[in-house]
Amino acid sequence: MSNNTSDLKSFHYLENGEVSFSILDTVKTEQKLDSGVYTLEYLPYPEMRVKLDVSTDRETIKIYTFPDKDKLDNLFDSFFNKNVIQKVKDLGFYHKVGVLLYGKEGTGKSTILKSYAYKVLENHNGLVFYFTSNQYVNKCWEFIKKIRAIQDNPIVVIFEEMDMYVQKTSEVPEGYLKTILDGNNSIDNCIILGATNYIDTIPNAIKDRPSRFKYVLNIEGIHSEEEILDILTPMISDICEKAEIKEYAYMLKGETLDSIKQFAMDKIMCLQSYSKNKKSMGFSPCK
């Protein structure tokens, strides 16, 4: 069975989580790729094939408010609006959009991306593809183009470390990435989501072109006490008094989502937590 991607005709779901594919018509296999979350990796010589795995990273995603949430909500609502889709089609354009999130580590960029991607999966029968390496991006993208040729599900592509794909160590030149975002390698009915901790490393020709990334949004720490309370309360309300949790929420203002979650986990595990640039936040001993 070949994994040549010239003419995809069948997909085989293996017990180890990998999805094998064939150029042959086969009996009792799927002729289209199931809606789901997948990781892509190209295996060089001697295998020389795309490795497609069903992603096991399907943690429960709860998204919290951030300053530009309404902007993203409206963008996704508009993307799936039937009138908008028809208008774009009438104009002869590909229906595609990109969003790039940036900010320091732990601000919840990946959580936000996953939340929107999984909504497309669940509400629109979408296909979500994660790139796992900056090597052989072109090989994996050619595979995605073959998927697009045989089915019309909305496709969401996630680059979690966008800066990695514009480094000199990347096997694929920056120019190829541009053609994916907005060029002869673009595909229809596609949403590209990227995240980076190092926005200054992203070339202006990529981050400042709305046709490549419609929105480039800074995701900061959480400054709303109420929102921090919403995060902490379901996690530690059974082991902390309401007044304690409110005090913790005040002390955690400006911290990242990751730091807040870790604070709660430390409390659950009876560990001492510290906040950067703030006084140490101690706990009463576990009973």
Please place each PLM-identified region on the residue numbering.
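Conserved ATPase-coupling elements of RecA-like P-loop NTPase cores
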Residues: 165-174, 186, 203-206
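Structural recognition of the conserved hydrophobic beta-strand(s) that form the central parallel beta-sheet
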Residues: 158-160, 190-197
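Short glycine-rich substrate-engagement loop in P-loop NTPases that contacts/grips substrate
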Residues: 121-152, 171-174
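A short helix-turn-beta junction within AAA+ P-loop NTPase domains corresponding to the substrate/partner-engaging
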Residues: 204-221
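Conserved AAA+ ATPase small/helical "lid" subdomain
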Residues: 218-224, 229, 233-287
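Substrate-engagement module of ASCE P-loop NTPases
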Residues: 176-191
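AAA+ P-loop ATPase mechanoenzymes
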Residues: 1-91, 95-106, 112, 116, ...
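Catalytic acidic motif of RecA-like/P-loop NTPases
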Residues: 163-166, 178, 182, 200
